[in-house]
Curated annotation (Swiss-Prot):
It comes from Bacillus velezensis (strain DSM 23117 / BGSC 10A6 / LMG 26770 / FZB42). Heterodimer of HisH and HisF. CDD domains: HisF (cd04731). Pathway: Amino-acid biosynthesis; L-histidine biosynthesis; L-histidine from 5-phospho-alpha-D-ribose 1-diphosphate: step 5/9. This is Imidazole glycerol phosphate synthase subunit HisF. The keyword Lipid metabolism does not apply.
Amino acid sequence: MITKRIIPCLDVKEGRVVKGIQFLGLKDAGDPVELAEAYDRESADELVFLDISASHEGRKTMTDVVEQVAAKLAIPFTVGGGINQLSDMKRMLRAGADKVSVNTAAVLRPELITEGADFFGSQCIVAAIDAKYDEDSDCYKVYTHGGRQKTEWEVTAWAKEAVSRGAGEILLTSMDADGEKTGFNHTLTQLVTRAVPVPVIASGGAGSARHMLEAFTIGEADAALAASIFHYKETSIKEVKDYMKKHGVNVR
């Protein structure tokens, strides 16, 4: 039986963890190094760090944070946000990240995925996809620039393209569900998990252990990502894992 992963996500802005709803209304949620250490102790399977500061200063802060976290973390972690070229990937991996996540830059220039996969291997490259239902075209469209810009890409078409170029994993966020805590978008998750042969991390909407269970049993995801429910201690990783075991889902 495949082992499912529980992954806390740290959205980092100006050196602090923040959380919003549908990518808006950001509130402070703590210190990234302290939170990372706590999640490591709680037996999280991995961590995802997303740098949502758009400035050059944000890049430097994030490199510092990654180095500090890497010094204390035993579990794998992925870093994304502002990774626009091979040199950005090198910097984050040198700082201690295990994987890098690419989003906007990869949609604008898909060769970035190929370059990263050729240089570091597919296991290091995560394609992060922000998707939202589009009524006009009756499909899920890919968004870039922190969810501000709609693209022409339909979500499964872009997921397949990213994987064909060497992405070893997909981090799929439902923009409609993000921060709402009403459950993952299983329709979207299942569409993508069935379209690609690589692991898919479901993101956006986790409000309870049951929601995370459903990401596996209904959405068919390989991993479930959550932020605010862990940051604000509404539940713990141990409680979520105990719930999974009770319902027959294999977790570490």
